[in-house]
């Protein structure tokens, strides 16, 4: 009986592995690099927008991929005269505008007008978003949360900007905020470089 059970188990494992192997062989990966159109091969952020475009943020520009070809774009606000090409975070809001986090703050891309606008805003206390952005997310009530490790966490809503100092300046190098999670119940959690988490 034990011998028959052992043989059946071995046959099951062999046939299962063959089925898994056949399923895996149907995948095909195509590589997109600097050699075939990407502005730079160090990709730091990826998002698919509601139009179906794939966006790749690199150390040297923003790239839009339609499944066939790549269009290289620069985050240049020609009205203000600022720009940045080191892309670190991407997010699409409810108005279908792309938020682009760079190492000098946030830009918004309006696809209808095909323009970038620098988010040169300040909180009521005079704090502005002017450093490297690690993450951008939204919650269910329309707040957009922006994590800037060198500063803290910002919340944007109704054309106003609010600032949350996650940790005090003494511990900022080891406790700088880096990632953020908005739970379905609305709670906002921030993770730091030092391994701590905070609820806002």
Task: Annotate each PLM feature.
Residues 1-200:
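Carboxylate-rich, polar loop motifs that coordinate divalent cations or form catalytic acidic clusters
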């Amino acid at each position: 009986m034990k011998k028959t059970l052992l043989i059946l188990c071995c046959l099951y494992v062999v046939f299962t592995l063959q089925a898994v192997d056949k399923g895996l062989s149907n995948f095909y990966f195509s590589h997109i690099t600097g050699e075939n159109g990407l502005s730079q091969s160090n990709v730091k952020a990826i998002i698919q927008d509601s139009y179906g475009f794939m966006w790749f943020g690199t150390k040297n520009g923003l790239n839009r991929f339609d499944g066939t070809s790549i269009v290289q774009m620069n985050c240049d606000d020609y009205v203000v005269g600022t720009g940045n090409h080191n892309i670190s975070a991407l997010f699409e809001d409810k108005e279908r505008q792309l938020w682009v986090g760079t190492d000098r703050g946030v830009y918004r891309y309006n696809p209808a007008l095909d323009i970038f606008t620098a988010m040169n805003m300040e909180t009521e206390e005079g704090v502005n978003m002017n450093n490297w952005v690690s993450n951008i997310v939204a919650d269910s009530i329309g707040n957009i949360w922006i994590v800037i490790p060198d500063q803290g966490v910002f919340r944007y809503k109704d054309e106003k900007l609010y600032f949350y100092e996650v940790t005090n300046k003494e511990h900022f190098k080891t406790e700088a905020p880096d990632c953020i999670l908005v739970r379905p119940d609305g709670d906002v959690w921030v993770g730091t470089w030092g391994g701590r988490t905070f609820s806002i």
